[in-house]
Amino acid sequence: MTTNPKPAYQRILLKLSGEALQGEDGFGIDPAILDRMAQEVKELVELGVQVGVVIGGGNLFRGAGLAEAGMNRVVGDHMGMLATVMNGLAMRDALHRAYVNARVMSAIPLKGVCDDYNWADAIRELRQGRVVIFSAGTGNPFFTTDSAACLRGIEIEADVVLKATKVDGVFTADPVANPDAELYDKLSYAEVLDKELKVMDLAAFTLARDHKMPIRVFNMNKPGALRRVVMGEAEGTLINSDA
């Protein structure tokens, strides 16, 4: 049962990890998971919520990992950006099959594949009810897709950045390694930094903090969790300036 008859947010930026798409295979894209995520996004669109999406590329390629093995970091990051484009195209296709209008915008030009990122075009598409998938990160090496999510969220004036993870939110410790770890309902930006909690990388988190962009961390694998978050129900961990 929802606590609010209307969505708590009008416009959101949903950050999905590439790993979330790979399922149990450990690599690539699981079509069943992709379709489920598309259906959950469709629910939000039907509620009248404007949805921007950023997807990581870790299910296909990780530039940082190969950089450690000797590859030039800039080259590796460029390859990682292209992986996020592939995930974005897959998500757009899944949304189209679910009868949801969606566009992929890339931070690096890929003529004939997807649209170039343009702030004004993105806002217009969102207002018209289309899902906008922001790919290729920020277009620059050395920045994560979490940074891209916060940047795009700020640019499109989203009400919140929703970071989808494999756990129920932010815990006092790693809940996988420590079953006694407790879930935080709310945190301030300062508390996250003071407690050295791993929400996202420091550059991304600082960007969100400086622009007072709320972040909610939740478990995308939990059925209905995304809808509950958007409806304002107690789900996951909310991070803002006055938690």
Swiss-Prot record:
Annotated segments matching region Involved in allosteric activation by GTP: 23-28
Keywords of the record: Allosteric enzyme, ATP-binding, Cytoplasm, Kinase, Nucleotide-binding, Pyrimidine biosynthesis, Transferase
EC number(s) given by UniProt: 2.7.4.22
InterPro entries: AceGlu_kinase-like_sf, Asp/Glu/Uridylate_kinase, Uridylate_kinase, Uridylate_kinase_bac
Binding site for UMP: G57, D77, T138, G139, N140, P141, F142, F143, T144, T145
Keyword Nucleotide-binding appears in the UniProt entry: yes
Gene3D superfamilies linked to this entry: Acetylglutamate kinase-like
Keyword Kinase: yes
Activation and inhibition: Allosterically activated by GTP. Inhibited by UTP.
PANTHER family with a match to the protein in the record: URIDYLATE KINASE, URIDYLATE KINASE PUMPKIN, CHLOROPLASTIC
Subunit structure: Homohexamer.
HAMAP family reported in the protein's UniProt record: PyrH_B (MF_01220_B)
Protein family: Belongs to the UMP kinase family.
Name of this protein: Uridylate kinase
Annotated organism of origin: Vibrio parahaemolyticus serotype O3:K6 (strain RIMD 2210633)
